[in-house]
UniProtKB/Swiss-Prot annotation:
Biased composition (Basic residues): 13-23
Name of the protein this chain belongs to: Nucleolar complex protein 3
Modified residues (Phosphothreonine): 193
Keyword Repressor tagged: no
Domain of life, per lineage: Eukaryota
Gene encoding the protein: Noc3
Compositional bias ranges of the Acidic residues kind: 76-86, 181-199
Principal location: nucleus
Entry coiled-coil feature ranges: 445-509
Keywords: Coiled coil, Nucleus, Phosphoprotein
InterPro entries linked to this entry: ARM-type_fold, CCAAT-binding_factor, Noc3_N, Nucleolar_cplx-assoc_3
């Protein structure tokens, strides 16, 4: 049975399958096949009978006819050619039965019309002229040139000059159409038909294979046009391939090969260089495909030869194995691209760096989307080394990726793996790494961790187990023993229900140990490292989970850094002070440590932040103020507390409005917690002793009680309305109700919320600035004042003589002297 190969699109194929008749059962198909075989054998037998009998009858009839025509003097060949076919059909019709005759009539072909004029010399000459003309026209078209319009240019005189150029005419190659027509009877109309998807031509890039290579000199404009056309063509091709993969990935796994060819520098199929834009598109497209079709679970290895599987399970396992192989091949190609810029002696051109950046970003996307799929740990290991590369854009991408993984990882397995690899990298490089290797650890969620809870749970479980064993060995009454045993089993089950939490807590504890190992190694071995600022920031962030045994040594190290290193910046100093006060405000309260020297460091660096590039660093001061003025206010003397209030309000004058609001919020909270600061609202300077020295760095001896908060008068006329209301509120003694009270929506905000909500770095002013009122400005007529008293008289004489005329322009602001002197 012949098959008909028809190329149709997916839409037509779906419509054909939809409108196709209901498929036959197996028995009906077997009967139909037997019927076709019988019909075919009968046809062959009929042809054999026809060939044997017709040959004898034909020879006899021809001999009789030849003799008759020869007796009449005619040429027997001409008549034979005309009537031979008709006599043959008549003779055969007599021999065949009804079924064979119907079959032959259905399959007979019409006789071809006899060509006339073969021996006519004029007609042959005309045919030769036509062929010569066609060949000459083809040669002219081959050598023909067409005109292309170029971009116009503008001359110095301002004239637009159009430009054209001539390029050789290249005819489009004609595609050969192969139409296979086979004759079938009516019983074969419902047979199977083989269809070929039209997307195969796009996947195999038939258009590029059939295009004739052009080897000639071309202009820059033609080159750019050809490049853009190639990009658009490959865009369309990539879209077709990706849509097929997303539609049914089980049947389209071979399409990955076409995308991998576009990722290479040289296309293996066409042996031509791929454009850089096409390579980037191919990498991004494959990444998006894997993000969609990869499963959330880890694919296991199943040996289909040793195990007997069901058909559905076998199909799934086959698909997963093929998908895993394609994913592995894709990761190998990405690793080859990044190795060109990461290894020594690699090709580090701007194009390869950009391509490697795209590859790194794609690996980051895969790590975030599927952190526990196969081979993803290899991605994480490669990205850890890219975190210390020499390209800031790649480091930023990996840094953001790791922070996202740390915040979204609930199982903590990938987080622990990444932290271990970072620790190994820093140890191998001897702390000579980029800052991103340390700052990415700030995304870890280890703020609410109790390291002593693990030991308590272990002791509790051991006690319950021993108590259960004692109850089982007792020889009391059965009912009483069963009752107690039930209660103990219930408590034991509750303890076992927390095993998952304990396993997670154990991983979190391991992460904390690894992080502080990194921090303490840098502080001990290389305190002058360029990552010291990031180390101190991390210590300030996670100081509440540091073990109590390390507190004394850590405070001594930080104090030595503050005093010995003169080149230490204000940011590092603020982080040191913040870390120390976080330690002392928590479990470090039991330590006998006097933080007076750290008060002086903090008081000295409070004015380092201003409304400029470092204004965002004021958040560090806010966090430290929360530890110093709020949590440790009872451990501070009145003089020190007043000195901090005065310096804080002085520093608010050269901050942006959100920093000023955060400062006033801290002062308001401190005023509400203590009544000692009410003396600063009194302008009587005889209360304190001595004179206030604002330049003294020791807050204990600057005599802040001898001054007042005069800055509130300036802030009451601030450009921001909320600052004005807050300053008036503090000046009235922070009343809850009455005159000077704040609205509820402002009074409930903390200093950190005020600093964030009123931030205008995104070009959004809070509250919204009202629009100006619409209207035209009124022109005010001015009044002239004469310096010379006799000027009016002299000008009046000129008017009388007619030498000065009256002005008619009423829209100007000039003085009309004529009307003024009338």
């Amino acid at each position: 049975m012949g098959t008909k190969k028809v190329k149709i699109s997916s839409v037509k194929r779906a419509a054909h399958l939809k409108s196709k008749k209901t498929p036959l059962s197996k028995q009906q198909q077997q009967k139909q096949k037997q019927k076709r075989d019988q019909l075919k054998s009968k046809r062959e037998q009929g042809q054999n009978i026809f060939s044997q009998k017709a040959r004898k009858r034909d020879n006899l009839a021809q001999r009789k006819k030849h003799n008759k025509l020869a007796s009449l003097g005619l040429d027997p060949l001409e008549e034979d050619n005309e009537d031979g076919d008709d006599e043959m059909l008549e003779n055969v019709a007599d021999m065949l039965d009804g079924d064979d005759l119907a079959l032959l009539q259905a399959n007979k072909r019409k006789r071809k019309a006899k060509t006339t004029g073969e021996n006519d010399p004029d007609q042959g000459q005309s045919i030769g002229l036509e062929r010569a003309y066609a060949s000459d026209t083809k040669k002219e078209q081959d050598a023909q040139k067409i005109k292309l319009d170029l971009l116009p240019i503008k001359s110095r005189d301002g004239q637009i000059i159009t430009r054209t150029t001539e390029v050789d005419y290249i005819p489009k190659p004609k595609q050969k159409k192969k139409n296979e027509e086979e004759e079938e009877d009516d019983s074969e109309e419902d047979g199977d038909t083989e269809y070929e998807d039209s997307d195969d031509d796009v996947v195999n890039d038939v258009e590029a294979a059939t295009a004739a290579p052009v080897q000639k000199l071309i202009s820059t404009t033609d080159l750019l046009i050809a490049r853009q056309q190639e990009i658009e063509r490959q865009k369309y091709r990539i879209g077709i391939i990706c849509s097929g993969l997303l539609e049914k990935p089980e049947d389209k796994m071979r399409n990955f090969h076409a995308l991998y060819e576009l990722m290479d520098e040289i296309n293996p199929a066409s042996r031509q260089a791929n454009l850089m834009a096409v390579r980037k598109l191919a990498i991004i497209s494959v990444t998006e495909i894997f993000k969609d079709i990869l499963p959330e679970y880890r694919v296991g290895q199943v040996d289909t030869k040793m195990q007997t599987l069901r058909k559905a399970t076998l199909d799934r396992v086959t698909f997963e194995n093929a998908l895993l192989q394609q994913f592995k091949k894709f990761l190998q190609k990405l690793e080859q691209i990044t190795a060109q810029v990461n290894r020594r002696g690699g090709l580090r051109t701007p194009q390869t760096v950009k391509l490697a950046t795209v590859a790194v970003q794609c690996m980051c996307d895969l790590l975030v989307a599927h952190p526990y799929f196969n081979y993803v740990q290899n991605i994480a290991q490669l990205l850890v080394y890219m975190l210390n590369c020499n390209y800031a854009e790649m480091r930023t991408a990996v840094h953001q990726c790791f922070r996202t993984v740390f915040s979204n990882d609930k199982r903590l397995e990938m987080t622990l793996f990444i932290v271990r690899r970072i620790n190994h990298l820093i140890k191998t490089k001897q702390n000579n790494v980029h800052v991103e290797c340390i700052t990415c650890l700030m995304g870890l969620k280890i703020k609410n961790v109790n390291l002593d809870a693990e030991k308590e749970n272990e002791l509790k479980q051991k006690k319950l187990e021993s108590h259960r064993q004692r109850l089982l060995s007792l020889s009391k009454k059965e009912r009483k023993r069963r009752k107690k045993l039930t209660e103990v089993n219930r408590e034991l089950e509750e303890t076992r229900a927390e095993e998952n939490k304990q396993a997670k807590h154990q991983k979190l504890t391991e992460i904390i140990k690894m992080v502080f190992t990194i921090y303490f190694r840098v502080l001990k071995n290389d305190p002058t490292s360029r990552v010291l600022s990031a180390i101190l920031e991390g210590l300030a962030e996670f100081a509440h989970v540091i073990n109590l045994d390390f507190f004394s040594d850590l405070i001594d190290v930080l104090n030595r850094i503050l005093e010995d290193q003169d080149e230490l910046g204000y940011r590092e100093r603020l982080h040191c002070v913040q870390t120390i006060f976080v330690i002392l405000s928590g479990q470090g309260e039991v330590l006998n440590i006097d933080p007076i020297r750290f008060y002086q460091h903090f008081y000295r660096n409070m004015l380092a932040v201003q409304a400029g590039k470092n204004h965002d660093d004021f958040a560090i001061i806010l966090r430290t103020l929360d530890e110093v003025l709020v949590k440790r206010r009872r451990n501070m003397s009145q003089q020190r507390l007043m000195a901090f209030m005065k310096r804080l309000l002085t520093g608010s004058l050269h901050l942006l409005h959100n920093g000023t609001l955060a400062t006033l919020g801290t002062i308001k909270q401190t005023f509400q917690l203590t009544s000692v600061l009410d003396n600063l609202l009194d302008t009587d300077t005889t209360i304190g002793s001595g004179r206030y020295d604002p330049e003294l760095d020791d807050p204990e001896y600057c005599n802040a009680a001898s001054t007042a908060l005069y800055e509130l008068a300036l802030l009451a006329r601030h450009y921001h309305p909320t600052v004005r209301r807050m300053a008036v509120h503090i000046a009235h003694g922070v009343p809850a109700t009455g005159e000077g009270a704040l609205p509820t929506e402002i009074g409930k905000l903390t200093s950190h919320e005020l600093f964030t909500q009123f931030d205008s770095t995104q070009m959004a002013f809070n509250p919204t600035i009202p629009l100006p009122k619409a209207g035209q400005p009124k022109l005010k007529r001015g009044k002239h004042l004469y310096i010379r008293s006799d000027f009016k008289q002299e000008y009046g004489k000129l008017l009388q003589q007619g030498k000065v005329s009256q002005t008619k322009d009423k829209q100007t602001l000039q003085i009309d002297f004529f009307s003024a002197l009338q």
